[in-house]
Amino acid sequence: MQTALRTSLPETELASRASFAPHARVVREERVVQASGLPLSIRGLRKSFGDNEVLRGIDLHIPAGQFVAIVGKSGCGKSTLLRLIAGLDKIDAGTISLGSDVQPEDIRVMFQEPRLLPWARVLANVEVGLGRDRASKDAHARAEKALTEVGLADKRDQWPSVLSGGQKQRVALGRALVSRPRVLAFDEPLGALDALTRISMQRLLERVWRDQGFTAILVTHDVSEAVALADRVLVIEEGRIAHDVVVNAARPRERGSVELAGLEGSILSHLLSADDRT
């Protein structure tokens, strides 16, 4: 399944784990949409690239529906961890468990680059996210609903080339949401956006997460973004989880509040002290 998807659209959010295939249902159009996220359990996870050991025994449990942000300096292993969870890279050692009855479409990834098909209109780009259900009778209706959820219903017939950067990322989000994933992983999805567009997208991500209840995993360099969105913030340092911060601030959260600023300062202090030790 994973190979076929990559052939038709390389490196998109259409991620699936090879172990999902035995559980795939034959009747696709009648799949019951799950309303809640999947729990995630990781034990002893290791990954190396050549002689470089990037992940060094990660142990982690994420309850169903939780929003987790992962931060750390460049090269610490945070994006590698996300790719292993999504099934985009092979595990060297350890296990990743995602509960029972997991389907390929239950996990989606949104990247920093929207990676839209330039020869397809906006609605068709969103339909790509349906994967094997793209030929179903309700494909157009599902794609239109996803576009409405991200505020771009009026752009359905536009070409990607005429969209702004923020609008392109909204289309990419709609493409990820159209299959109603139970785990949605974000790899620096807002990194290339201007400050105001980024805040708007943060609020959109939080809203769709609260509405749909999927488990969210966000990799970001922006600590303020992490504390604004997440229930937990994990600090990765030299391939291990060095810090696990619970964010108890009430939602919707007030950006720049004393509470969030304090959490941000604590995490930044830890990251800076790690630099001082190296």
From Swiss-Prot:
The keyword rRNA processing does not apply. It catalyses: ATP + H2O + aliphatic sulfonate-[sulfonate-binding protein]Side 1 = ADP + phosphate + aliphatic sulfonateSide 2 + [sulfonate-binding protein]Side 1. ATP binds at residues 72-79. It is a peripheral membrane protein. It is found in: Cell inner membrane. Its EC number is 7.6.2.14. The keyword Phosphoprotein does not apply. Part of the ABC transporter complex SsuABC involved in aliphatic sulfonates import. Responsible for energy coupling to the transport system. This is Aliphatic sulfonates import ATP-binding protein SsuB. It comes from Bradyrhizobium diazoefficiens (strain JCM 10833 / BCRC 13528 / IAM 13628 / NBRC 14792 / USDA 110). The gene is ssuB.
